[in-house]
């Protein structure tokens, strides 16, 4: 089994990039779009990961301070070295809709990329709920939230699912972001039991009365979460915008068809995600 990463909770700045590593990060972040730019950025990124030798790096990314561990999490690697390539279409779409009192629910929050992106652009009246079931990844999420002064992000350590109780999570130790409550192709990191709650129960417990946007990145468990939610939750809690990871090979139903039958329009398909907007969302506020 691959080496398990241990989180380092020292004060922010203890792992600030210096010297050659800092120059590699700067160069990778300046790489443009296009085939040649991406090839250069990915080459630099690989050099940087090797230079870190499993250590984290303290940087600003997506408008927030984060401690990122690129060795075992692809999302963290992207945010550290190439944030310009980190879901740019999704974040642009989301960014255009952020208001001072934005309500955002991040299901499968990982270490907080989306949640902190929203927090950096919303006002003090915003509410951001970041849900992450993996204990080690949740610990990184909490650390990153605490390095910023937003005071609008709340984290929950649980899995959103189709039941309340406990579920088995299958771990991919090479990419913590690929772990799932559905069996994953490379679950060489073993498995663990995590707390599970229905999404509707989570939101009710938080006292939310609306959701402006929700992101679901659950490595193939999106249907398990959304199907019971859209069947049973009050319509006032249906998100105006949904960003849903596109993993049809793992779903047990036609999730896009189900979502569209519930009154959502697909606005965009990107490399990894589907973006939906609820019919009439523009007039709901």
Residue ranges and their predicted role:
Residues 1-285:
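Phosphate/nucleotide-binding beta-alpha loop and adjacent structural elements of enzyme active sites
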